[in-house]
Regions:
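NAD(P)-dependent Rossmann-like dehydrogenase/reductase catalytic/cofactor-binding core
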Residues: 108-176
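A generic, residue-level signal for flexible/boundary positions that often mark functional hotspots
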Residues: 1, 17-20, 61, 125, ...
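Internal alpha-helical scaffold of NAD(P)-dependent oxidoreductase catalytic cores
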Residues: 14-16, 29-123
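Histidine-centered active-site/metal-ligand motif
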Residues: 21, 76, 146
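Rossmann-like NAD(P)(H) cofactor-binding subdomain of soluble oxidoreductases
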Residues: 1-32
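Short, well-ordered alpha-helical microsegments
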Residues: 3-7, 50, 143
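Generic, ordered loop/turn and secondary-structure boundary motif
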Residues: 8, 24-27, 37, 76, ...
Length: 176
């Protein structure tokens, strides 16, 4: 999440600093490089060669966005949320199913098609087109039942994420 500002005193060496970041989950240092051609890259740094770096990566077939150093941490937080926090949410939901009597294997197996289907729909139709469920249907009774069944962190996470889902539902159904 570091910006090119980390290269302090770089002008003294007549050099230019850049921060180039793939928006990509690298979970295996020996295999992930094989599909990095699918990654979206961000580039931040000295204006002198920004366009050169952008063209270089676009020449490899990667989409590129130039961002400011001030936005680097917020950009990285968005990436961490959609990647790493999604893993945490999946783990929490598997735990919830285990608490309902599912084996660990069956909890994972049960949620996998739901996660894959929603991920594919989000990618294809964006969040507003992918949204389904009780908040999208304006089914307050089901949402309240869900909240009544939860406690602690699971309840707080459900509430907090529901606020964001409600924004998507309002975009999808502005007439409501």
């Amino acid at each position: 999440s570091l910006s090119s500002a980390v290269f302090s005193d770089i002008e003294r060496y007549h050099a230019y600093g850049y921060s180039i970041h793939p928006l990509f989950a690298i979970n295996d240092k020996y295999e992930s490089y094989k599909v990095i051609s699918q990654a979206f890259f961000t580039i931040e740094g000295d204006p002198k060669y920004l366009n050169w770096f952008q063209k270089l990566f676009e020449g490899f077939g990667n989409p590129v966005e130039i961002i400011s150093g001030q936005d680097k941490v917020r950009y990285h937080a968005a990436a961490a949320m959609v990647s790493n926090l999604y893993v945490g949410l999946a783990n929490l939901c598997e735990e919830m199913l285990r608490n309902c009597g599912f084996s660990s294997a069956n909890a994972h197996r049960a949620l996998s098609p739901l996660m894959m289907g929603n991920t594919e729909n989000i990618v294809q139709y964006r969040p507003v087109g992918a949204l389904t469920g009780p908040i999208e249907r304006n089914d307050l009774s089901t949402v309240m039942d869900h909240l009544d069944s939860l406690s602690g962190e699971a309840r707080k996470i459900y509430q907090d994420l529901s606020v964001e889902v409600l924004k998507v539902a309002r975009e999808k159904h502005p007439e409501r």
